[in-house]
Curated annotation (Swiss-Prot):
Name this polypeptide is given: THO complex subunit 5 homolog
GO cellular component term of the entry, any: cytoplasm
InterPro entries: THO_Thoc5
Annotated positions of the Phosphoserine modification: S5, S6, S307, S312, S314
Role description: Component of the THO subcomplex of the TREX complex which is thought to couple mRNA transcription, processing and nuclear export, and which specifically associates with spliced mRNA and not with unspliced pre-mRNA. Plays a key structural role in the oligomerization of the THO-DDX39B complex. Regulates the expression of myeloid transcription factors CEBPA, CEBPB and GAB2 by enhancing the levels of phosphatidylinositol 3,4,5-trisphosphate. May be involved in the differentiation of granulocytes and adipocytes. Essential for hematopoietic primitive cell survival and plays an integral role in monocytic development.
Organism field: Bos taurus (Bovine)
GO MF entries: mRNA binding
Keywords annotated in UniProt: Acetylation, Coiled coil, Cytoplasm, Differentiation, Isopeptide bond, mRNA processing, mRNA splicing, mRNA transport, Nucleus, Phosphoprotein, RNA-binding, Transport, Ubl conjugation
PTM sites of type N-acetylserine: S2
Length: 683
């Protein structure tokens, strides 16, 4: 036990000469502990220069002590451990000094940053005040300019010349001695003379009105006399009817047409009756006529489907009995197809005349074996149109009536029973025959009173007059709207192909006065080419790029920047707006996938299209969208920040007034144009 206790050494306590003995606490130490100590307050009292000198001195002392410790360890000796311990304690004290200096330095740095932030906030506040003051100055300057440019209404009055005024005006009005030297009094005198002349003319006007009333009374008396002759004329006309019938007068043509209508098949007859009634009641510009051979129609004394079935049965028997006729199987199928797709000899022709003297010629046919109606369309205008290259499909018979109602493209039969008939003769689809037979649109069937239930296919369908009457007015209005819309697009495309975006006077307020970007190319593209573009994948995947739509490519340029716009034009334009997809080639390729501002430009054209419709019926929507696209490109390029590493002036100087160049973390640019102030802002 004694040996173990002797091995345990008590730790040595080394005190400096000036340090107080451990365990003895003086009164002054107790008072200091009661006070609050703060290094942040001490920073304000200390001199940074002296702290720096203390730092250098402490580092030098540490270097010296480390060297001495190294020297003592290398020499060894009995008293070396005590000296090394002494120097170690001194080094610890110096390290504590360095830590304190480090804390003080961090506190000074934080205070410096806080002071810098406060100063920056003050500068930002002053800068905002300066911008507000500049805006107020600009507003006041505009108001001053308006006041200076103000024109009084008396300036719009066309006064007589000075020579005529002093020659004709009485002296009490002209007052030559006063007005000769005073332009203000001269103007007042001329206005007084103008007022006097207008009073005299007003008196003459009242006299003329009284004379007019007298003449109108005389006219009424004569009209009453003439109206008394009407009953006599009617009786004379009634008595002359046998003579008119004997002489075959032209009015008998309508009666003949009604006689011909008796030989129409039921769907065409319903169409003829309802269209004639609609023309007499609502649209005097609608003319209805019947074309075709009446004799051939009379020869159809029995249902053609029965004879066709009998023929098919006899052909089947012949094929079973003999093998020599097998090589003519293709010819037989062609004959069967022709018989299957045979049209009725009579057809109904509707001429729908629009306000601009353009006429839509509709010829309705009835396929007897398929029990469906088809239509062929043709548009004629009062003046011959020069067809642009991009407008080739607008008035083509294959597309002019496509999707008059949504989804009604007229490429397949609306009668479900026809598919079983097609299987017998090897017809895959009716799409291959619509150019010759016409398009079997659903609205055509409804105008003929035909309705085909999809759940229970029926071969024989009864026509319904009420179905035709309920769809007649709506369909006629849609047809007129479609023709006017296509003709408007036809004229616009002629300008677009020459790089001119036609903007009517009613729509000038939608755009700034100066638009630098210009349209350089407008061409039509195929549906396959549109789907292969890399920046149109979103539209294709969303199902908005159908094969019934029309597709175009526009190119807008300004300087080195080129903006491509792929346009999807729905057949229902302008009730359904076009869809634009953009790709900007400037400092790289930018689309809506890698540039939020390109997405914002597409939103301005596609989403905010109602601002660009213009006056009803909105045929200027497409050209207004293209003009808006040119304006958006100007804003995009002019608000782009200038690269300081590039020498020379900015390629696109800012000419548009913008309240704020960027907004939000995505730095969206101000694309909304505010009329009549003329500045751009964010939405």
């Amino acid at each position: 036990m004694s040996s173990e206790s002797s091995k345990k050494r008590k730790p040595k306590v080394i005190r400096s000469d000036g340090a107080p003995a451990e365990g003895k606490r003086t009164r002054s130490d107790t008072e200091q502990e009661g006070k609050y100590y703060s290094e942040e307050a001490e920073v304000d009292l200390r001199d940074p220069g002296r702290d720096y000198e203390l730092y250098k001195y402490t580092c030098q002392e540490l270097q010296r002590l480390m060297a001495e410790i190294q020297d003592l360890k290398s020499r060894g000796g009995k008293d070396a451990a005590v000296e090394i311990e002494d120097r170690r304690i001194q080094s610890c004290v110096h390290f504590m000094t360095l830590k304190k200096l480090n804390r003080l330095a961090h506190i000074r740095l934080k205070k410096g940053r806080d002071q810098t932030h406060e100063a920056k906030q003050k500068v930002d506040a002053y800068h905002l005040q300066l911008q507000n003051l500049l805006y107020e100055v600009m507003h006041l300057q505009k108001e001053i300019t308006k006041c200076l440019e103000f024109k009084s209404k008396h300036e719009e009055i066309d006064l007589v010349s000075l020579e005529e005024f002093y020659k004709e005006a009485p002296p009490d009005i002209s007052k030559a001695e006063v007005t000769m030297g005073d332009p203000h009094q001269q103007t007042l005198a001329r206005l007084d003379w103008e007022l006097e002349q207008r009073k005299r003319l007003a008196e003459k006007y009242r006299e003329c009105l009284s004379n007019k009333e007298k003449i109108l009374k005389e006219i009424e008396v004569k009209k009453e006399y003439l109206s008394s002759l009407q009953p006599r004329l009617n009786s004379n006309m009634q008595a002359s009817l046998p003579v008119q019938e004997y002489l075959f007068m032209p009015f008998d043509q309508a009666h003949k047409q009604y006689e011909t209508a008796r030989h129409l098949p039921p769907p065409l007859y319903v169409l003829f009756v309802q269209a004639t009634a609609y023309g007499q009641a609502c649209d005097k510009m609608l003319s209805v006529a019947i074309e075709g051979s009446v004799d051939e129609a009379k020869a159809l004394f029995k249902p053609p489907e029965d004879s066709q079935d009998d023929e098919s049965d006899s052909d089947a028997e012949e094929e079973q009995t003999t093998k020599r006729r097998r090589p003519t199987l293709g010819v037989q199928l062609d004959d069967k197809r022709k018989e299957m797709l045979k049209r009725h000899p009579l057809s109904v022709l509707l001429d729908l005349k629009c306000k601009d003297d353009s006429v839509l010629h509709l010829t309705f046919y009835y396929l007897m074996n398929l029990n469906i109606m088809t239509v062929k369309a043709r548009v004629t205008t009062a003046t011959e149109l020069i067809t642009p290259i991009s407008a080739g499909d607008l008035l083509s018979p294959d597309s002019v009536l496509s999707c008059l109602y949504p989804g009604d493209h007229g490429k397949k039969t609306p009668n479900p029973a026809n598919q079983y008939q097609f299987d017998k003769v090897g017809i895959l689809t009716l799409r291959d025959y619509v150019l010759d037979l016409g398009h079997p649109y659903l609205w055509v069937q409804k105008l003929g009173g035909l309705h085909f239930p999809k759940e229970q296919p029926q071969h024989t369908v009864i026509t319904d007059h009420s179905l035709s009457a309920s769809h007649m007015e709506t369909t006629m209005k849609l047809l007129k709207t479609r023709v006017q819309s296509r003709l408007a697009l036809h004229k616009q495309f002629a300008s677009l192909e020459h790089g001119i975006v036609p903007v009517t006077s009613d729509c000038h307020y939608l755009f700034p006065a100066k638009v630098v970007s210009r349209l350089v190319k407008w061409v039509t593209i195929a549906h396959e080419d549109y789907t292969e573009l890399h920046f149109t994948k979103d539209i294709v995947e969303a199902g908005l790029a159908g094969d019934t739509n029309l597709y175009y490519m526009a190119l807008v340029e300004r300087g080195t920047a080129k903006l491509q716009a792929a346009v999807v034009l729905n057949p229902g334009y302008s009730s359904i707006p076009p869809i634009f997809q953009l790709c900007l080639n400037w400092k790289g390729e930018k689309t809506n996938n890698n540039d939020d501002n390109i997405r914002a430009m597409e939103s301005e054209v596609n989403v905010c299209y109602k601002e660009l419709c213009g006056p009803r019926p909105g045929h200027q929507l497409l050209t207004n969208q293209l003009q808006r696209l040119c304006v958006l490109l100007d804003v995009y390029l002019e608000t782009e920040s200038h690269d300081d590493s590039v020498e020379g002036p900015k390629e696109f100087p800012q000419e548009k007034m913008c309240l704020r160049l960027f907004r939000g973390p995505s730095r969206i640019k101000p694309f909304k144009y505010n009329h009549p102030q003329g500045f751009f802002s964010h939405r």
